[in-house]
Each structure stands twice: as C-alpha cells, then as structure tokens.
C-alpha cells in the first residue's frame, strides 16, 4: 500500500514530475501486496477478498457476490495502469543496481522511487554477514540517490531487544529506539529520515508508554531521525476489518485513555 500512496494525486498535489516506482518485494508476494491495496480501496479486509473471513451469523466463510467481484476487478485493472513495477526475486546489490539502471534508461522522463522490502533478504556475494550487507546496502542507496535524484525507501526489521520483559514492563522503555533496529548503525547514517513502526499490542502491552495510551489497534511510528524536519511520534489506528490506517492525534488518544479509565471505574 505504500507504493500505491505515491500514485495518489490527492495526497501528492505538490509532485511536479511523473514518477516510476521500482518495488523490490523480497518478503511479500506482489500479488498479496496488490490484493491488500484493493481491499483497502474497497474498505474490506484482506481475508474478505480471499473469501476466508468467518461470518458469525451464518457460521460460514464469506462469499463474494457478483457486484463485489466486479468492483474488485475494476480496482485490479486500475492498479495495472499505475507506474509501479514489482520485483519478487531477490538478487545481490549489484543486480539490484543494474535493474535500476536498466529501467532508468527506459523511463528517462520519470523520477524514481525505489523501495527495498526488506534489505536483509538481498543475496550476499562479498558480504560475510548482515552487518556488511547493511553497510553495502546503505552505500548502494547513496549511489542511486545521487545518480538519479531518487527517493530510496529501505525496510528493515527490529531485533529482539524490544521484546524483553524489562522493556515490555517498564513504560519508560517501551518506545522503540535506534538500537532496536537490526544492524541499525550500518544504515542509520545514510538515511535522511528513520521511522520505526511498532505495534505494542502484539507484545501484550495494554497501556503504552508513560502516557498509558490504550494499545488496542494502536500503531506507533517513532520518527527518530529527520535531517530536514523534526523528530517525534506519529500515532495511527489500524482498522483491519476495513484495511484502513487512520491518523490519530495525541488529544484523541488521551480521550480514549479517559474513556477506558471511566469504564474501569464504573466496573469497580
């Protein structure tokens, strides 16, 4: 869905150039990625589009009717004509760079947006470990950015530090930090912006951080580096039943917290 957002003219009114998105999807199948995007457009869950969403009333899985099927086909057809190219087979960094060069020569009038998801799945050639791979990935990204004035988005993963009991149980330690990024030092320096996405609910945290925000469906994007902007926190709510991600303000989160506290007192 990230790539699709860049093609949304309403979201990107200030774009002055046509774009081409080269999406290196080593982890998730491109078909799954596109299906999730279509589900979001139709405000349905991913499971619903696969006819695998359990219906409590009928005690059976959902069935897609003819109208819904037609709507789905229309959305898939729209995506076919968007400037996004998906690459599912992982290669080494030299092959990735060659691929970018190849398409840059074909689409000379477009600005490039390159996403790599995720970086640790690139094949190693001269690299002996993940640290060397991440360091070379950073160097590769810098070369491509300078060569084509491209936007490079690197998706990495967290290590296990944030899952430790001391982190989960201490509200002051629950926010993700730089050291939580796997091989973070090797790529942090190369990035203009670094954002860590975190779902505290998945770690069994009910009240998140020193603010004690309710964690149900909460997404926390910690902006820990912003070369031309400000560091801070972005709060979102996941409505998975409709494949939506909604923005939340701190005041809205505080309101939810107060409602939870009121309900707790009423139960007592």
Short names for language-model regions:
Residues 81-144:
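Phosphate-binding/switch loop-helix module in NTP-utilizing enzymes
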Residues 22-24, 87, 153, 195, ...:
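Hydrophobic/aromatic beta-strand patches that form the interior of the parallel beta-sheet core
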Residues 23, 115-116, 150-157:
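Structural recognition of the conserved hydrophobic beta-strand(s) that form the central parallel beta-sheet
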